[in-house]
């Protein structure tokens, strides 16, 4: 399976690590906000194995308390990751 299905996975993992959250804890926090998410889905997002919807992106910004632009890599690192 391709690992280039999203560009925000690495930053999702980074923000999660910064907060000391497990994938299960992040999934639970997202579920409390109304976003269906499991540890397995989080793992696939972080390893860039699945597409992330615009609605999921909104939930990630809310749960992490960041602007949407912070989820996306800088242009230079985006080009290097492809």
State what each model feature region is.
Residues 12, 23, 39, 54-57:
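Helix-turn-helix DNA-binding elements, focusing on the entry/boundary residues of the two helices
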Residues 12, 16, 26, 60-61, ...:
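Hydrophobic packing within well-folded, soluble alpha/beta domains
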Residues 36, 49-52, 79:
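Short, solvent-exposed alpha-helical "recognition" segments
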Residues 49, 53-70:
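DNA major-groove recognition helix of helix-turn-helix/homeodomain DNA-binding modules
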Residues 17, 31-32, 47-49, 76:
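Residue-level detection of the helix-turn-helix DNA-binding "recognition helix"
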Residues 1-19:
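A short, Lys/Arg-rich alpha-helix, primarily the initiator
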Residues 20-44:
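Short alpha-helical DNA-recognition segment
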Residues 2, 62, 69-82:
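Short, charged recognition helix plus adjacent turn
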